[in-house]
Amino acid sequence: MEGKLSMDSQILEEVIRSGNIPCHGRTGMLCAGGGLLPPALLDESRVPKFYLDALVASGGTSSTALPNTGLVYNLMGTSGLPKDVLSHIWSAVNRAKPGQLTRPEFFSLLALIALAQKGESLAALCAMDSLPIPYLNPVQAFPTASNPAPTTNTSSSFVPFGKIKPSAFIPTSLLPRRSMRKKKESDSKEVSAHNSPAKGAAHDLAGLDFGSDISSMKEEIKDINETPTQSCWRETVHAIYIVVEEANQLFKDSKKEVIQEISETEKGSAYFKSLSKAFDTLERVCKSAGVQLSVQSTKEAEYCRNLRRKWETFMDTTPEQNVEMTDDRKCAICCQPVQNPIDYGGQCFDVTCANLWVNGVSSTLPSLHLK
């Protein structure tokens, strides 16, 4: 009985950790507003002055201004943490809008950096009355009331993706999914990585760790005759495949009754709703691609469909009613009429497709310029 409870506990924990399946309008498996941290700790009247100074230094100069993404990236770089740890922290807190932190999310980011620096897990917050203070070097980056720093930001604090210089730690996916796209490193490197305190902190933040057995599929070699649109479809299908395969690794050894129980919880229901959105995006892409879909992408799509049929009873298949759907433009990714449009770089994207792309493929949306 103890083993069964342990398995159930692991599944629930992994469902919570894997809540970063990018879908529009979903707050994920986390608390509203700031993501991983209790909302009470993120109240601006309670956060340490250090947090408010850091917010001002990052572009949040008024009571409603959001932090400047480019400045936040620079601030993260002063923490001394490895780039993959910073990437995971960003993915954990960036919930509301890809590439732009809200003010509570910014506070969450600072708190997770502090925990990672100390090698502590999220559980440590239970014993804290206020948010931990991270070490950021140089501290001169934060202006004080007596010596305010000049600002050159004359417009909005939001920096569009296209104006942000590429950063090696900008998250393109959760770390477990990112690892599925990489080759296995040598044993010596793996031992070194596991012995690193910073890596241990990242593992604490990540929750359960998948084994390397789910990384057996190699990334398909790009066809030299592939058009930009076909490449976009291939990348999108593969990103969905990775999301679905991660879910399969989570549930494949679980009994149907256990999965059913999870699907009836608030967090489990949101998880399966997110999977359902990923499946819907897959069908939109396949409908546009038709016979132009590559052989490998076709295999991945069929694999996903088989699992969708297997999990159909756990997912709410009721179509969402969108009374505001009056836009007849097509999404630059799936090439189907947009349901929740977002404009970027002179193109129109469906929000679900855009979030999937930013979290699973690249931090920059594709430039296809559909007519």
Swiss-Prot record:
Residues 179-205 are annotated as: Disordered. Residues 43-148 form the EH domain. InterPro entries: EF-hand-dom_pair, EH_dom, SYNRG. PANTHER family: AP1 GAMMA SUBUNIT BINDING PROTEIN 1, SYNERGIN GAMMA. This is Uncharacterized protein R10E11.6. It comes from Caenorhabditis elegans. The lineage of its organism: Eukaryota, Metazoa, Ecdysozoa, Nematoda, Chromadorea.
